[in-house]
Curated annotation (Swiss-Prot):
Belongs to the DPCD family. It comes from Danio rerio. InterPro entries: DPCD. This is Protein DPCD. Transmembrane segments: none annotated.
Length: 200
């Protein structure tokens, strides 16, 4: 089963851990050369950020792509042209039991939204009846484990100009995450500033 293959890939990956800013930061180097970086909140053990870097066609290092977490609005390009801050902002932020997406700066009433799972296309689709917003997105965690997309696991709500979409994690994912978290806690993570300095 693909869940076991992904679990094995995670176990075989070379892992480095660092504890900093109240987060456990873990870097994975996979056998195929791809890299994954994750950050977990130390108090809640929730995944705060996950990003990937895949090898390029010519074997070089590609750019980091964010899978979970919020993009940093103040980057190196802050002086250049940037999109309007009132545009809808799509991001993923997971909880212990659900995959969760938030779309900020979207102010229509709840009845305007339609969120559906498309099992044949293996994606979820957000539509508005006023045709002002449309978005397709997949769930990479389900793709990696080759688990089916269930429309009954999908729900959504709207508050404070933010549409919140939740997808209940399948039991296979919950079990895998618990096992992985147990292994990560066993990793000897260094803290910032914990560098061996020999006194003279």
């Amino acid at each position: 089963m693909a869940v076991q293959q992904w679990a094995d890939a995670l176990k075989k990956a070379k892992k480095t851990a660092l504890i900093s800013d109240g987060k456990r930061k873990v870097h994975y180097q996979f056998e195929d050369g791809n890299e994954m970086a994750e950050e977990y909140d130390l108090k809640t053990d929730e995944l705060v950020m996950r990003k990937w870097r895949h090898k390029t066609t010519f074997g070089g290092q590609g750019q980091w792509t964010l899978e979970v977490g919020e993009t940093n609005p103040t980057g190196a390009t802050s002086d250049l042209i940037k999109e309007n801050s009132s545009n809808p902002l799509f991001m993923r932020r997971d909880t212990k039991t659900s995959f969760q997406w938030r779309i900020r700066n979207i102010s229509y009433p709840l009845e305007v939204y339609s969120v559906t799972a498309e099992p044949m296309e293996r994606c979820c689709v957000i539509r508005t009846s006023n045709k002002k917003y449309y978005k397709k997105f997949s769930i990479p965690d389900l793709e990696r484990c080759q688990l089916p997309l269930e429309s009954t696991a999908l729900s959504f709500t709207h508050a404070n100009n933010t549409l919140i979409i939740s997808y209940k994690k399948p039991k296979e994912i919950l079990t895998l995450e618990q096992e992985l978290l147990g292994e990560l806690k066993k990793l000897k993570g260094t803290s910032e500033g914990d560098i061996d300095c020999k006194t003279q």
